Amino acid sequence: MQFTLEFGGGLELLCDSVKIHKVNINLLNDSDILTMKDLLSWVRTNLIKERPEMFMKGDTVRPGVLVLVNDCDWELSGQLDTTLEDKDVIVFISTLHGG
């Protein structure tokens, strides 16, 4: 499955300062669905280059990270249980900024 992953609000610094990633992810365990929980695990293993604790806490994103799936807040679509489809666009934006 192909996805576009976008990181903003400083989260791109955890991914070698690359904001937009076009990725191909194989389905896990020959399943025909991929959930946000699966995607977050893949992102932690394959994209986050440093300080993963700044992006994730446990199996989910840290408080203060806004997640959009096709421009829709993931809280409206089931959060970790959100089912992803080919060519979805997932955006991660940190709402916490130093000052």
Curated annotation (Swiss-Prot):
Enumerate the subcellular locations listed in this protein's record, separating them with semicolons. Answer: Cytoplasm
Query: Which pathway, metabolic or otherwise, does it act in?
Result: tRNA modification; 5-methoxycarbonylmethyl-2-thiouridine-tRNA biosynthesis
- A GO CC term? cytosol
Could you tell me at which residue positions the Glycyl lysine isopeptide (Gly-Lys) (interchain with K-? in acceptor proteins) crosslink is annotated in this chain?
Answer: G99
What keywords are assigned to this protein?
Cytoplasm, Isopeptide bond, tRNA processing, Ubl conjugation pathway
UniProt modified residues of type 1-thioglycine: G99
Q: How is it modified after translation?
A: C-terminal thiocarboxylation occurs in 2 steps, it is first acyl-adenylated (-COAMP) via the hesA/moeB/thiF part of the MOCS3 homolog, then thiocarboxylated (-COSH) via the rhodanese domain of the MOCS3 homolog.
Where is the major localization of this protein? cytoplasm
Q: Which InterPro entries match?
A: Beta-grasp_dom_sf (IPR012675), Mopterin_synth/thiamin_S_b (IPR016155), Urm1 (IPR015221)
Question: Span of the secretion signal?
Answer: none
Which biological process terms from the Gene Ontology are attached to this UniProt entry? protein urmylation; tRNA thio-modification; tRNA wobble uridine modification
- Role of this protein: Acts as a sulfur carrier required for 2-thiolation of mcm(5)S(2)U at tRNA wobble positions of cytosolic tRNA(Lys), tRNA(Glu) and tRNA(Gln). Serves as sulfur donor in tRNA 2-thiolation reaction by being thiocarboxylated (-COSH) at its C-terminus by MOCS3. The sulfur is then transferred to tRNA to form 2-thiolation of mcm(5)S(2)U. Also acts as a ubiquitin-like protein (UBL) that is covalently conjugated via an isopeptide bond to lysine residues of target proteins.
Q: Could you tell me which HAMAP family the record lists for this protein? A: Urm1 (MF_03048)
Family assignment from sequence similarity: Belongs to the URM1 family.
Q: What is this protein called?
A: Ubiquitin-related modifier 1 homolog 2
Name its species.
Arabidopsis thaliana
Q: Which gene encodes it?
A: URM1-2
